[in-house]
UniProtKB/Swiss-Prot annotation:
GO terms for cellular component: cellular bud neck septin collar; cellular bud neck split septin rings; nuclear inner membrane; plasma membrane. It comes from the Eukaryota. It is found in: Bud neck. The gene is AIM44. Residues 1-35, 138-167, 190-210, 242-261, 602-632 are annotated as: Disordered. This is Altered inheritance of mitochondria protein 44. Residues 245-261 have a biased composition (Low complexity). GO terms for biological process: maintenance of protein location; positive regulation of mitotic actomyosin contractile ring contraction; protein localization to cell division site after cytokinesis; regulation of protein localization to cell division site; secondary cell septum biogenesis. Its main location: other.
Length: 678
């Protein structure tokens, strides 16, 4: 039971060297006793790593269960342990080599074979080129003489000396990374190549025969490879590699072969398609250049053929005169290219619109561009010629062009414009520009706009400019932005006739039972504009129009308020009658009395309002030369008051009139039912 526990190596989670694990040795097998050297940990690791999995399944399953055998253990994935458990064989770094080297057949660790009387060591060769050269030169010189002596010495070595040589040679270190089994089969080719490269003489055939004989004798005497045989094979392989290198270097200098397999087609970045597209573009460009050159040559030939009739002297004089002009043009081009702005800031200052959409509202800038003073016409021909000569003598640099700066549409400029709009100070230039920038339709519109501008000057606000697509015309006036749309707030200053028409339509719709005639209101301007000698046109449209509007508004407000009052009182009476059906005949009569009184009052007041314009018509017909005196408006009709009552006291509204709120209010067509107008 204890033997079974000892034979299975324990697993630990240690990933580094830990104490006594270095001295671990496997127990001897059941077949026979083995020396301590054969049970060494490092030797067993190298031996098991060199074997294939199918050769010794027991050893590989015992040693490589957690390390490299991917076929036997499902936890491993690429030759290294994935679960973190290490066997005692994988303690130090000296026992492990890179997994890439174990994939090759020729790079295998050495094997120490145990026999009854002696140990025959199959040594290895390092891949270090310096050691290969030293050993190759040494062994090649003393190959024939010292071969038997080395065999006897190696046989007479003890197990301790063998163990020391194993520890020095077989364990991989930083200098000795990997090992190589050499084969004697390539011996003949190596010697033949080396003899041909050294001396190109017929004596090399003798050397070939001697080497063949010695190699055959060595192979026949020793079935297993001895130390000298392995050294010979390594020597032959090293010489073979050197001869190959020299032959390739001498025959032809070839580039290193790439691992990629490519066809013999055109090797270019992106394949044949990109190659031919680039080729087509180049050919097209060259064809265009050739065509331009041919056209220039042909047109020049035509021009020169026209001037063949001239003499050579004139032609030479023309060519001489052309030379300084061409030079001057080249200088100007160079100067312009050097002065041209490069950075965005320079382009912006020099007038290049780069990444900024600059729109000019030309209609708003027209009064600024046009000079206010009218130039006087000079009829003297002599003065005109002198002025032309003076302007021609002035160089181009001194002439200054008056250009208006472009308006940049940036958030900061829009904010600045909005802050200017809030200020109440108006400059006389702005008012003059605004006055000039108004659109002229006809004489009547001009008079209205001039009166409007005079009223706006006192307030100090900017006037709405002429219509343009740019934002500048809207940003100069008070406006508001709603969902990325600029809505101007100065629309109330302009007369909108639709409002008056809507009010008339609403008033006509509301008069279902009662009809009020509005023809006298339309006849009022005719009476004012009857005599031509009475007042000019400006007085007619400037002064009396406002009075007529106020009179018309006053009339409508009184009519609408009385209608609303009457309807509310009738609704309250009907509501109380429906809620109290058990009323007596006296109570119903008492309710009908105030309604009848309201109707009579309304008729009398309506007749007074209609008679107002009838009296004016009679007076205007009888006295046309006298001034029309408008009746003064009553103060209590200009503003109205209403009383707000709670909806719970609607039934007892006739008895108690306790007002919750009492405020003066202007006319409104949408009054709620709970309000009582007084």
């Amino acid at each position: 039971m204890s033997g079974m526990i000892i034979r299975t190596p324990t697993r630990t989670k240690t990933k580094s060297f830990n104490g006594k694990q270095m001295d671990f040795t496997f127990p001897s097998p059941v077949r026979g006793s083995v020396d301590e050297h054969s049970l060494d940990n490092h030797r067993i690791v190298n031996e098991t790593l060199s074997l294939k999995p199918q050769e010794d399944i027991e050893v590989s399953s015992q040693m490589l269960s957690d390390y490299t055998s991917s076929a036997s253990n499902a936890n491993t994935y690429s030759g290294n342990s994935s679960n973190g458990y290490y066997s005692f064989a994988n303690i130090s770094d000296n026992t492990t080599a890179s997994p890439k080297l174990h994939n090759h057949n020729n790079m295998v660790s050495p094997i120490l074979e145990n026999t009854e009387s002696s140990f025959q060591l199959q040594t290895v060769e390092s891949l270090d080129p310096q050691r290969q050269r030293i050993r190759s030169t040494y062994e090649y010189g003393h190959m024939g003489s010292n071969q038997n002596l080395r065999q006897t010495r190696e046989k007479s070595k003890t197990a301790e000396s063998i163990s020391t040589t194993i520890a020095q040679q077989t364990i991989p270190t930083a200098d000795n990374i990997s090992f190589d089994f050499s084969d004697i089969s390539g011996y003949e080719d190596a010697v033949s190549n080396k003899s041909e490269n050294k001396n190109h003489k017929p004596q090399n055939s003798v050397v070939k025969n001697q080497l063949r004989a010695t190699s055959r004798a060595a192979i026949s005497t020793n079935d297993s490879p001895s130390l000298s045989n392995v050294y010979m094979s390594s020597l032959i392989n090293s010489s073979l590699e050197s001869t190959r290198k020299t032959s390739t270097a001498s025959s032809s200098v070839r580039s290193s072969r790439s691992s990629l397999k490519r066809s013999n087609a055109v090797r270019c970045k992106g394949g044949l398609l990109q190659y031919f597209t680039k080729l087509g573009i180049k050919i097209r460009k060259n064809c265009n250049k050739l065509r331009l050159v041919m056209r220039r040559k042909l047109f020049r030939f035509k021009k020169n053929s026209k001037s063949f009739s001239r003499s050579n002297s004139i032609r030479s004089g023309l060519e001489i005169s052309k030379l300084p002009k061409v030079r001057h043009e080249k200088k100007l081009r160079q100067e312009s290219s050097s002065i041209a702005p490069h950075t965005l800031h320079q382009k912006r200052t020099h007038g290049f619109n780069n990444k900024l959409h600059k729109s000019m509202s030309l209609k708003s800038l027209q009064p600024a561009l046009v000079s206010e003073t009218v130039p006087e016409i000079n009829n003297n021909l002599h003065d005109i010629l002198e002025s032309k000569e003076k302007t021609a003598d002035v160089p181009a640099a001194t002439k200054t062009m008056k250009t208006t700066p472009s308006l940049r549409r940036t958030p900061s400029s829009i904010r600045r414009a909005a802050s200017i709009l809030t200020s109440n100070v108006a400059t006389p230039k702005a008012s003059a520009n605004n006055r000039n920038s108004m659109i002229e339709y006809d004489t009547v519109e001009n008079s209205r706009i001039s009166s409007r501008n005079s009223s706006i000057k006192s307030k100090g606000r900017l006037v709405r400019s002429s219509g343009s697509v740019g934002l500048s015309s809207i940003a100069r006036q008070p406006s508001i932005v709603v969902k990325n749309k600029v809505i101007p707030l100065s629309m109330s200053r302009f007369s909108i006739k639709e409002e008056i028409k809507e009010e008339e339509e609403e008033s006509e719709e509301s008069t279902s039972d009662y009809y009020v005639e509005t023809e006298p209101v339309e006849a009022a301007p005719r009476t004012l504009a009857g005599p031509k000698s009475y007042a000019p046109e400006n007085f007619r449209y400037g002064a009396n129009v406002d009075d007529i509007k106020t009179l018309y508004k006053h009339y409508l407000s009184t009519v609408i308020s009385r209608r609303i009052k009457m309807r509310l009182e009738m609704a309250q009476g009907e509501h109380s009658a429906t809620n109290e059906p058990a009323l007596t005949h006296q109570s119903t009569a008492s309710l009908k009395d105030p309604i009848a009184s309201v109707l009579t009052e309304y008729d009398s007041e309506g007749s007074e309002g209609t008679n107002l314009f009838d009296d004016e018509d009679d007076s205007s017909a009888s006295e046309e030369d006298d001034e029309v005196v408008l009746p003064p408006l009553k103060g209590h009709n200009s503003t109205m008051s209403f009383v707000v009552q709670s909806p719970f006291t609607r039934q007892n509204s006739m008895a108690s009139s306790s007002a919750l709120l009492y405020l003066p209010v202007k006319r409104s067509l949408t009054l709620p039912i709970g309000m009582k107008i007084t």
